[in-house]
């Protein structure tokens, strides 16, 4: 017997499932450049698409790693064998993925690169990838004993309204350094004109169309805008 569930409970259950999956993959696939997950439910099975920069490492040798992840997810969420399938998909625009850049920044700092150099490297790479704007914020005990935040930004970036949801991609990561935990926040604004889905321009964008060139008027003239039939009927002489 199929258990009936209300719409509200279904939405909450789907949200919890997605959040748990995302957190699990964030921990497990950090080194593989994990940048998001998508869940597609079909009548026969549930498809989980893992987006990462290094898909070969996610798959593993002869698909061993992806099979291990499938078994873990299947056991945790009590799916029947064969009803949940995991796929790995390469991130198309790595420079426009905030999660991928936050992970990149994290590993740069762990490898001992200076904060300024790492942040400017990320900002430059994002802007070269065709972003409209980028902002990287690093906060924590950066040099002195007192915590502070450093902000690195370039281009055009909006901070409020519905366009933030449409065009801004945000990611937050934490990195454990010798002096303490540092917080990394990356915001990337995609070019609205290149957006595949949703609005193609900002709400306040105004496009000014250049007027067409008109022929110069050499002499005054009268243009008749009446229909041709009416003009012909008026032109015909009336017989007595």
Curated annotation (Swiss-Prot):
Phosphoserine found at: 97, 129, 221
InterPro entries: KH_dom-like_a/b (IPR015946), KH_dom_type_2 (IPR004044), KH_sf_prok-type (IPR009019), Ribosomal_S3_C_sf (IPR036419), Ribosomal_uS3_C (IPR001351), Ribosomal_uS3_CS (IPR018280), Ribosomal_uS3_euk/arc (IPR005703)
Annotated compartments: Cytoplasm
Ranges of residues in domain KH type-2: 21-92
Cross-link (Glycyl lysine isopeptide (Lys-Gly) (interchain with G-Cter in ubiquitin)): 106, 132, 141, 151, 200, 212
Positions where Omega-N-methylarginine occurs in the chain: 146
Record Gene3D superfamilies: 3.30.300.20, Ribosomal protein S3, C-terminal domain
Record note on modification: Ubiquitinated at Lys-212 in response to stalled ribosomes. Ubiquitination leads to activation of the No-Go Decay (NGD) pathway and degradation of non-functional 18S rRNA: first monoubiquitinated at Lys-212 by MAG2, followed by formation of 'Lys-63'-linked polyubiquitin chains on monoubiquitin by HEL2 and RSP5.
Modified residue annotations for Phosphothreonine: 44, 70, 231
UniProt record, GO biological process: cytoplasmic translation; maintenance of translational fidelity; nonfunctional rRNA decay; ribosomal small subunit export from nucleus; ribosomal subunit export from nucleus
Any one cellular-component term (Gene Ontology): nucleus
Effect of residue 108 to E: Impaired ability to rescue stalled ribosomes
GO MF annotations, alphabetized: DNA-(apurinic or apyrimidinic site) endonuclease activity; RNA binding; structural constituent of ribosome
Region: Disordered, residue numbers: 212-240
Known partners and oligomeric status: Component of the small ribosomal subunit (SSU). Mature yeast ribosomes consist of a small (40S) and a large (60S) subunit. The 40S small subunit contains 1 molecule of ribosomal RNA (18S rRNA) and 33 different proteins (encoded by 57 genes). The large 60S subunit contains 3 rRNA molecules (25S, 5.8S and 5S rRNA) and 46 different proteins (encoded by 81 genes).
Note: Present with 146000 molecules/cell in log phase SD medium.
Biological role stated in the UniProt entry: Component of the ribosome, a large ribonucleoprotein complex responsible for the synthesis of proteins in the cell. The small ribosomal subunit (SSU) binds messenger RNAs (mRNAs) and translates the encoded message by selecting cognate aminoacyl-transfer RNA (tRNA) molecules. The large subunit (LSU) contains the ribosomal catalytic site termed the peptidyl transferase center (PTC), which catalyzes the formation of peptide bonds, thereby polymerizing the amino acids delivered by tRNAs into a polypeptide chain.
Protein name stated in the entry: Small ribosomal subunit protein uS3
Species assigned in the record: Saccharomyces cerevisiae (strain ATCC 204508 / S288c)
Gene coding for it: RPS3
């Amino acid at each position: 017997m199929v258990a009936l569930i209300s719409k509200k409970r279904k939405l909450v259950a789907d949200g919890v499932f997605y959040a748990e999956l995302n957190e699990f993959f964030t921990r497990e696939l950090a080194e593989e450049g994990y940048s998001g997950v998508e869940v597609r439910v079909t009548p026969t099975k549930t498809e989980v698409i893992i987006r990462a920069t290094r898909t070969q490492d996610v798959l593993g040798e002869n698909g061993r790693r992806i099979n291990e992840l499938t078994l873990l997810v299947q056991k945790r969420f009590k799916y029947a064998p064969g009803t949940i399938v995991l796929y790995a998909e390469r991130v198309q625009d790595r420079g426009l993925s905030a999660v991928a850049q936050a992970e990149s920044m994290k590993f740069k700092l762990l490898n001992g690169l200076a904060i300024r150099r790492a942040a400017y490297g990320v900002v430059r790479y994002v802007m070269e990838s065709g972003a409209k704007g980028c902002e990287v914020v690093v906060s924590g005990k950066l040099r002195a004993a007192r915590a502070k935040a450093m902000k690195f930004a370039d281009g055009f970036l909006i901070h409020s309204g519905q366009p933030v949801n449409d065009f801004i991609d945000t990611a937050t990561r934490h990195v454990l350094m010798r002096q303490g935990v540092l917080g990394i926040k990356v915001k990337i604004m995609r070019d609205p004109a290149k957006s595949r889905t949703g609005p193609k321009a900002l709400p306040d964008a105004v496009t000014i169309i250049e007027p067409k060139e008109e022929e110069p008027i050499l002499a005054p003239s009268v243009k008749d805008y009446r229909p041709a039939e009416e003009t012909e009927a008026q032109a015909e002489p009336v017989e007595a």
